[in-house]
């Protein structure tokens, strides 16, 4: 449901060149992520009148392509004012270190384009009414004072009384008795219980009471065929939770729809047939697996100029590593001044799509932007994360999930090829920062054929654990923050989309650079350099419309014009000064090219409406952003 395509910002520390040189001279010695007998009629098999055989190859359209930078950046901001700073050219703004590794807990997944769900009427068609079985002595009548319906776990006696009352206290032909039985069966059918129904067992009329027995249908077994690497139990277990007795058509339909939306499956066919015992059925499912191996090649200018804006990235993901539906992903990112690697493993825990995931990332960077390159500023960072996510509500159109993430992040920066520790905000005397935190998150998604709404909330508690940085005064690893993110994608016309995004962070105290909120860059306020503003709290909003201007049906290609407006504001807590300016506003225009699901290319031009000091040596700093995403397979 993109989740929020806005880049989740890291943090940083800043200082001016004069201070850096003075420290370099005076501190050269410093240390561097849960009883039947013969009856009036035989106990029937309540099944659809025709076998159900559905074959689907419907696939959801590709996700909105949002380049979420998992890379690693930190920023330098003024901290000291010394006379030697006069040697810096006046048009050069405080420059940036690479942002620290950005773990998955700060990167919500992109939402998909609104798309129709697999049609229900092609899955399990509603059966016709049960036929009345011919029998002898149709002119015989009886008088019934009361009917007793037994064997039902679905309907109450009061609900059955509404159906049986017109057949009591009067002479009743035997044929009417069977009409009543059929009416009770129809009640089940109308509520989706297509393999349940009623029959009249053998009995002697006593005290004017006739017993009608209900057989509530259930599955005898689920057979799965067509799997290659994927375990059949992956499919079977997800259908089993929706097919508990009594078997309900609507619940089975929803389970089949959810299964068809699973990226591990390309197509699905299902057939319901009679089992070996009365009231039992066999569900046969034929699946075709989708390719579980995917790769992405990304080239853009989404990194900070201090380490080189041009980013090269390769991502490889295996969605079914061991046959359990477990996903293993790896990515490598490179710029002229940085290298980063990110690994993740996601293991399904239960048929309700609960998952346990582990993520690791590591990055090393060097400042290559003049005039700061002479200081030989280097940084290293890594994160570890362990996360549990469990959908609480899951339907083809809505999902509500809760999760908990334990994260550990650490960074280290030095000057002069590692000779002097970098005096980062909140760092220890060795220039190191360590953070341990628990994140409790909530995610909600609503989708229809015309819109997708995605919401994400996350509460983070910083901990004094795992050698975390603890200082006499903040910032350190002890903090509390809340982050809320939202996205609404609306289909206005064919291939015409409205995309609204929002992002808000509120903290209770000054934050370590690792947890600060950033504004500026390709996935934030376009028109400014990456992370032009960094602060403890922040708000970001964006509106974008995508208009088709060229369609290439033979090539499955689409070119869209994308006008947009971005704005954001950031502010600090405690004694730290607010950024100046604290608000960024920009408008702009872009082109977006989509070629099948193999290529997505984008070019944006952001026009800043708020002036900000700084050099304009790169395309990014002049408001131009490009992105090319290639998916070979």
Describe the predicted segments one by one.
Residues 270, 293-303, 314-318, 324-336, ...:
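Transmembrane beta-strand segments that form the barrel wall of outer-membrane beta-barrel proteins
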């Amino acid at each position: 449901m993109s989740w929020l395509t806005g880049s989740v910002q890291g943090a940083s520390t800043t200082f001016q060149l004069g201070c850096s040189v003075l420290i370099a001279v005076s501190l050269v010695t410093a240390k561097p992520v849960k009883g039947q007998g013969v009856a009036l009629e035989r106990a029937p098999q309540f099944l659809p009148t025709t076998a159900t055989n559905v074959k689907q190859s419907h696939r959801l359209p590709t996700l909105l392509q949002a380049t979420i930078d998992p890379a690693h950046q930190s920023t330098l901001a003024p901290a000291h004012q010394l006379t030697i700073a006069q040697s810096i050219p006046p048009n050069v703004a405080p420059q940036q270190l690479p942002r620290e590794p950005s773990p998955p807990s700060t990167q919500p997944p992109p939402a998909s384009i609104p798309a129709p769900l697999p049609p229900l009427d092609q899955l399990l068609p509603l059966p016709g009414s049960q036929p009345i079985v011919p029998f002898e002595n149709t002119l015989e009548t009886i008088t019934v004072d009361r009917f007793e319906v037994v064997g039902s776990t679905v309907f109450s006696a009061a609900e059955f009384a509404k159906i049986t009352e017109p057949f009591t206290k009067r002479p009743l032909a035997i044929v009417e008795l069977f009409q009543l039985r059929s009416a009770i069966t129809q009640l089940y059918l109308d509520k989706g219980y297509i393999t349940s129904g009623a029959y009249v067992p053998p009995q002697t009329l006593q005290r004017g009471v006739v017993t009608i027995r209900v057989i509530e249908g259930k599955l005898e077994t689920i057979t799965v065929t067509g799997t290659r690497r994927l375990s059949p139990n992956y499919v079977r277990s997800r259908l089993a939770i929706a097919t508990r007795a009594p078997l309900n058509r609507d619940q089975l339909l929803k389970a089949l729809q959810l299964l068809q939306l699973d990226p591990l499956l390309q197509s699905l066919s299902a057939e319901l047939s009679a089992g070996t015992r009365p009231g039992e059925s066999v569900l046969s499912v034929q699946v075709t697996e989708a390719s579980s191996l995917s790769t992405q090649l990304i080239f853009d200018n989404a990194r900070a100029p201090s380490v080189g804006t041009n980013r090269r990235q390769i991502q490889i993901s295996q969605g079914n590593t061991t046959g359990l539906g477990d996903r293993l992903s790896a990515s490598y990112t490179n710029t002229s001044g940085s290298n980063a690697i990110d690994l993740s493993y996601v293991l399904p825990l239960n048929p309700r799509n609960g998952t346990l995931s582990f993520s690791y990332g590591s990055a090393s960077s060097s400042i290559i932007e003049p005039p700061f390159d002479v200081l030989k500023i280097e940084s290293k960072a890594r994160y570890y994360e362990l996360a549990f996510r469990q959908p609480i509500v899951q339907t083809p159109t809505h999902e509500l999930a809760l999760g908990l993430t334990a994260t550990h992040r650490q960074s280290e920066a030095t000057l002069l090829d590692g000779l002097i520790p970098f005096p980062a905000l909140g760092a220890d005397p060795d220039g190191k920062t360590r953070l341990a935190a628990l994140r409790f998150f909530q995610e909600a998604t609503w989708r229809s054929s015309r819109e997708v709404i995605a919401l994400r909330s996350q509460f983070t508690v910083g901990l004094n654990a795992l050698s975390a940085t603890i200082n006499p005064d903040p910032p350190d690893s002890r903090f509390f923050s809340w982050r809320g993110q939202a996205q609404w994608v609306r289909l206005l016309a064919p291939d015409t989309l409205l995309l609204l995004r929002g992002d808000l962070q509120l903290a209770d105290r000054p934050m370590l650079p690792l947890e600060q909120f950033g504004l500026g860059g390709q996935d934030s306020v376009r028109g400014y350099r990456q992370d032009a503003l960094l602060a403890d709290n922040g708000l970001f909003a964006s509106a974008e419309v995508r208009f088709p201007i060229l369609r290439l049906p033979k090539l499955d290609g689409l070119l869209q014009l994308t006008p947009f407006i971005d704005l954001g504001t950031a502010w600090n807590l405690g004694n730290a000064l607010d950024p100046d300016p604290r608000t960024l506003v920009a408008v702009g225009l872009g082109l977006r090219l989509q070629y099948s699901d193999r290529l997505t290319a984008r070019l944006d031009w952001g026009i800043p409406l708020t002036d900000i000091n700084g050099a304009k040596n790169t395309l990014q700093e002049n408001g131009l952003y490009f992105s090319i995403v290639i998916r070979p397979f």
